[in-house]
Amino acid sequence: MTHLVPLYRFLGSHLPWSLPRLKFLSLFLIARIRCRTVNWVELSNGFNPHANSRSSYRRIQRFFAKFEFGALSIACLLFSMIADPGGTYTVVIDRTTWRFGQTALNLLCLGIVYQGVTIPLFTDVLDKKGNSNTNERKKRFQLLVDFTGVDGMEAFVADR
């Protein structure tokens, strides 16, 4: 747990959350990396070696049941972690379909490129089949512009 304090301090400099929430998120992220899974039961085993895994599991459940992540806060955190201050970045927007069990999710994702990989900042589930329309794409793009501006934007990439 030597990484816990630097991680929650870093997160605290970007997220306006209480210390217990920052500590939980830090534990959760470390467990996620250590366990290489998103399964809460398995994550609870890697959460705190001195705590009962059922207690850790209930802690995970309570956090996600009672706390609402602000999409803009998470996007700001990700952006501040990967964008070079004063540097340029490429924006990518794409519509894709993911399967969640038997359910097909039609997603519109907007992200920035980091070391050749697009990191999604905003993702919307489109309540329809097929492509997004211009207004949906403009709405996502405007969210990014509202908190980053356009100064460092080198390129905007979209298909079609």
Regions found by a protein language model. Name each.
Residues M1-R160:
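Conserved, well-structured functional cores that handle cations and Mg-NTP chemistry
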